[in-house]
């Protein structure tokens, strides 16, 4: 953690905007209110997010590589197969439930993957913030290396791209290891709609 603090200190001169400026604080206080499980603790950036903000999503390459390595080493890969059930994975990917004020606390969350990615050819509407994942199992295969990569990317995308916009679905506790394995199956199983 000390190395991380030194990195942030060293990059403070790269700040493009002060995310805690009085104007931003005023907007946050005016527009965001805690309600149910949707609390205000989600708003402050953690150290990695702040580093990316302050560097315009382009921190020095050596620093990004070192921090990505730290993030990669923090991923707790489960024992055995990383492939779950693609049918459950499809429900998780297409569902938009979880961590909002109207959701029941403690209920299983969904991944909302469709908000950022195209998953299957049949989808009529999908987000384009992230890359299309259509046919990913065909292009990457579904062996142990592909499974490990996809599991890790879903668990903590910042291990592969420090300034990724993809949420850290496992590291944040949003999804369980079993749910992530189901998403791995959706993306890599040849029988899933993603790869048909």
Where are the language model's segments positioned?
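Hydrophobic h-region of N-terminal signal peptides that target proteins for export
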Residues: 9-17
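Positively charged n-region of N-terminal signal peptides that target proteins for export
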Residues: 1-4
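Local sequence-structure signature of Cys/Sec-based thiol-disulfide redox active-site neighborhoods
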Residues: 101-112
């Amino acid at each position: 953690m000390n190395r991380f603090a030194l990195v942030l200190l060293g990059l403070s001169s790269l700040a493009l905007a002060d995310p805690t400026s009085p104007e931003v604080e005023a907007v946050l206080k005016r527009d965001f209110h805690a309600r149910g499980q949707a609390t205000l603790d989600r708003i402050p950036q953690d150290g990695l997010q702040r580093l990316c903000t302050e560097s315009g999503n382009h921190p020095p390459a050596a620093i990004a590589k070192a921090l990505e390595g730290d993030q990669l080493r923090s991923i707790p890969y489960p024992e055995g197969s990383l492939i779950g059930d693609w049918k459950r994975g499809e429900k998780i990917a297409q569902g938009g439930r979880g961590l909002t004020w109207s959701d029941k606390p403690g209920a299983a969350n969904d991944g909302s993957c469709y908000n950022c990615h195209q998953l299957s050819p049949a989808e009529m509407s999908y987000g384009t913030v992230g890359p299309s994942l259509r046919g990913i199992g065909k292009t990457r295969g579904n062996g142990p290396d592909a499974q490990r990569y996809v599991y890790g990317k879903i668990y903590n995308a910042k291990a592969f791209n420090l300034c990724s916009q993809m949420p850290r679905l496992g590291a944040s506790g949003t999804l369980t290891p079993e749910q992530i394995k189901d998403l791995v199956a959706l993306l890599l199983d040849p029988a899933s709609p993603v790869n048909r």
